[in-house]
């Protein structure tokens, strides 16, 4: 560094101490950056006086320190009070005191630094989004009855992706899965998660979306408390199931999701199954039978009551009329019950046929096979294949691996190529 060579000639006008101090005061107090500044440091001393708090902030390495004051008018609004040894974040402005030739930070508010600051920011964001209605249960979407395609947003390296694949394959044969990989940890994760969700929405095939990652430390899950991620889930046009962390973890993404499952496996289990729909249908039939039986019992009791009245009246003619009316009512009721039961049975048979036609295993049982490439692409044409390519062939019972030895196009494919 080149040393400064002062000009030793005394000018006609020199600054007074006040003039120099006023100049420094103007520089500091009128600086736009210092009008409202955030300062982080450790409280090295603190005292409460009638006029307010007086304390000193210093760096942990004690390389620098600054005197601070909080006047009484702000003390009742403080989030925390200054305590010696605490790492805090102070909001205030720089003031110069000419009498002492010192500058200090006139603070308005104090916040905990480090983990305390993260917790405070989380709570503030949660309260603001709650006021906006993002966590309102009435805004949540219902899951589709029997989805054919599900989107999954998670890391391809995470165990969560493996858990989801195994669960969906075991409980939902034939379900198509659209995987949109993303980072789920680090500073770049929030933006990556938003882009992954947008890819699924833009594709347009998924009927429900799973957003998941495995458990971890609180800071590892911070990306799922990011406002960008929370709003992306809230604005998603299809239902979202969150499976983030473990039971003890609760992120803002869990609160805004339509269904919160806490773990990736549980999130996959939330996808409605065909067997569940069949069970619901059987339960509906059972409830219908109970209702009709109760109606029949009520009608039977009414008939017995009318019969008793006729016996007490001992009027043959009126008894005959009541007897005829009872027979008509009984026949009408039995006819109505048979008709309703017949309709229910026909509806059940129709639904059973539809369910059977939707079951991919029924097609395989007729001698067909499902041929897939190693990356799980379904083979529909020889144009997708190459000689010596390895294929997975799934039958009604079991599967095996095959290798292409020769290719022969169908007449239609040959015409298309020409």
UniProtKB/Swiss-Prot annotation:
Primary localization class, coarse: cytoplasm
CDD domains: ExoVII_LU_OBF
Record's GO cellular component terms: cytoplasm; exodeoxyribonuclease VII complex
Domain of life: Bacteria
Name under which the protein is recorded: Exodeoxyribonuclease 7 large subunit
Keyword presence, Cytoplasm: yes
Function per UniProt: Bidirectionally degrades single-stranded DNA into large acid-insoluble oligonucleotides, which are then degraded further into small acid-soluble oligonucleotides.
Subunit structure: Heterooligomer composed of large and small subunits.
Catalytic activity: Exonucleolytic cleavage in either 5'- to 3'- or 3'- to 5'-direction to yield nucleoside 5'-phosphates
Species of origin: Acaryochloris marina (strain MBIC 11017)
